Amino acid sequence: PYTTLFRSFAESETEDKDWINNWKQYFKPFTVDHILIKPTWETVPEEHKDKLLIQIDPGTAFGTGMHETTQLCIRQLEKYVTPDSEVLDVGTGSGILGITALKLGAKHVFGTDLDENAITAVGENLEANGIAPEQFKVVQGNIIDDKTVQDEVKYEYYDIAVANILADVIIMLQKEIPVHIKKNGVFITSGIIDMKEEAVKAAFEANDAFEIVEITHQGEWVSVTARKK
């Protein structure tokens, strides 16, 4: 029985490793407007050499950039990032949104994530993109209810907050985020499936701190951007 147990454990570990590596064959270079996102192990296609390059290896953290919700957020970041932007990236995952903000010229990014793997993934992706680690700080924890994380993030500090998570989490976040962003700062959200759009809109509309400035769609996914009054 011990041999069988060991074999099944070894097979399961091999399957996990196979899964971690197999998805890579589906992650190919792609563009979002003038930005080229590519995995670190692929070369830059000749026809895209003039684009703004972002290289990503998610490792075990979430975020290749291929999902519609990430692309929706990237397009909003393109509109709002300036050279002075301080950016808060909630649920940073691989760091793709924060790194995009920095590549677009943002001054600094602060990321939070529940998954400790995000810290390693962001560090590796910063290196792959030639970005100094001090430009992007990441902490593990929940900004919604962890006072230590909330204090570390700082208050009334950010020009932009971005969260590509899930609609139900966005609904909770819209209560907390206003205390962390400056007046007239924007909160860019996605991860919202179309059937949840009305619930997210209603939550923002019921919050006196925000006014919705834009709602965009891609496929069955939605991005809501709100400005702090």
Residue ranges and their predicted role:
Residues 8-10, 36, 108, 135-137, ...:
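Conserved beta-strand segments of alpha/beta enzyme cores
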Residues 1-5:
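Short, small-residue-biased leader/transition segments that mark boundaries at the very start
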Residues 6-47:
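N-terminal auxiliary segments of SAM/dcSAM-dependent transferases
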Residues 50-58:
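A short, charged helix-loop
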Residues 114-228:
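S-adenosylmethionine
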Residues 60, 64-143:
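Conserved SAM/SAH cofactor-binding pocket of Class I
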